């Protein structure tokens, strides 16, 4: 029986042991993911754009359509997807084939670092050599993500959603780990600062030869609850589509709604709590676009 190591056990792994495990883990990873029809990364490069909330709503929306969906939080230091999908406090179960993921009330298989920690609010601490600590930590983080994907019994999935943490370096490591990624959705907002950072993520994905890259513009506008008028939150900047070497498709434009954050904080999706809201309808449009992609359309 194989168990995913706790973060204390990961921290005690020596460099030589880590290197010896990589080939074995890669083989397990390839075997495990062969049962997954579509590998979909939701990334940005910039924090604070609502990426995890969109991932959670996308996962729930696809599951409600009857798809077998898995979701993993690749943010080891600040995981939030487990809470948003209402599996906080769930106990992981070992099986002969590996570790069973937590199952959300909406039928989404979930794996997150918070499920491996004894205390939900405990910060993740890495034991590292006195020299080269940053490089060591990066290797450990990549190794843990490899285990999340390779040692968890995902089973036959229509899609596995990977919530990528902020930072273009995190995107780069994911692309190195999963060169066969099927789709990368890059979440942005209309702000000029976010556009600048996400443009770098676009370039990384294009250089990695990811065939399918889509943009999701979150907080695209604010809809007045009284009159229904939509107004821009950030003004108008150059479209990200124009930054790309080749035109990028816009997969979704999501209006700002404070209830989106409030619902995910409670472990519920906006498409379930406020299905008729403008933002929920926009999220459903994104779900429909991704569902067609999963089917091969």
What label would you give each PLM region?
Residues 266-277:
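C-terminal boundary of histidine-terminating zinc-finger modules
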Residues 68-70, 74-123:
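Phosphate-binding loop that captures ATP/GTP phosphates
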Residues 22, 151-154, 158-262:
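Conserved catalytic-core segment of NTP-binding enzymes
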Residues 1-45, 90:
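Extreme N-terminal, non-catalytic leader segments
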Residues 287-297:
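Short, hydrophobic alpha-helical segments
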Residues 117-175:
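Phosphate-binding/switch loop-helix module in NTP-utilizing enzymes
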Residues 36, 47, 73, 81, ...:
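Residue-level signature of catalytic and energy-coupling elements of molecular machines
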Residues 38-73, 202:
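Walker A/P-loop phosphate-binding motif and the immediately C-terminal alpha-helix
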